[in-house]
Amino acid sequence: MVRFSPLRDRQLPACQMIWLGGGYPELHAAGLSANHEMLTQLRAAHRRGVAIYAECGGLMYLGTTLEVTSGERYTMADIIPGHSRMGTRLTRFGYCEAQAQQQTLLAAPGEWLRGHEFHYSDFSPATPAVLACRKQRDGKTLQQWQGGWQSGSAFASYLHVHFAQRPTMLNHWLRAARRAL
């Protein structure tokens, strides 16, 4: 595993997989948008089939644009077509599970992922979601929504997953990375 910063670095390290974790891209939107070299390299990696996984803030970075609370809009990677918009209230919080509706980078159709969501933003996608998500308590479904988007070899969602809870997620991701070699 090689660390890199989409904010500070100008070049992607040589890799077959990219993991863009959570964070607060809205606090660095201008800098992320201004790093044209990194955005260009990330798009080129996607075109080559590099397996890209992004969660929460990573989803916002892979989107087309990010609108911060002041109303300013910044261009992002445009790998997952859609628009992120920051709000002032918590949009979703807590543990949930999601069932893949089609093949994704981390799951085959029908497989379940468990994770946690915590975000103040909304993502308005240009393509259909690939996960059916739900929040349950005491065996009762409290909420249901659609989430997660797949674009070629890239998958992004608000869901923060833990690979140890379902090791097959990592197996799916590794298989996708091998296809890009």
Model-derived segments and spans:
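Acidic, glycine-rich loop-and-beta core segments that form the ion-binding/anion-interacting portion
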Residues: 1-42
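Structured core elements
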Residues: 1-3, 19, 54, 61, ...
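Glycine-rich, charged/polar anion/phosphate-binding loops
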Residues: 2-8, 62-64, 99-103, 141-144
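Solvent-exposed alpha-helices and their adjacent loops that cap or buttress functional pockets
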Residues: 10-12, 44, 53, 106-110, ...
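Generic hydrophobic alpha-helical scaffold/packing signal
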Residues: 16-19, 29, 39-46, 63, ...
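Short acidic (Asp/Glu) and glycine-rich catalytic loops that position anionic groups and cofactors
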Residues: 18-24, 58, 152-154
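Cysteine-nucleophile active-site neighborhood
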Residues: 25-105
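Amide-donor transfer/coupling interface in amidating biosynthetic enzymes
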Residues: 86-181
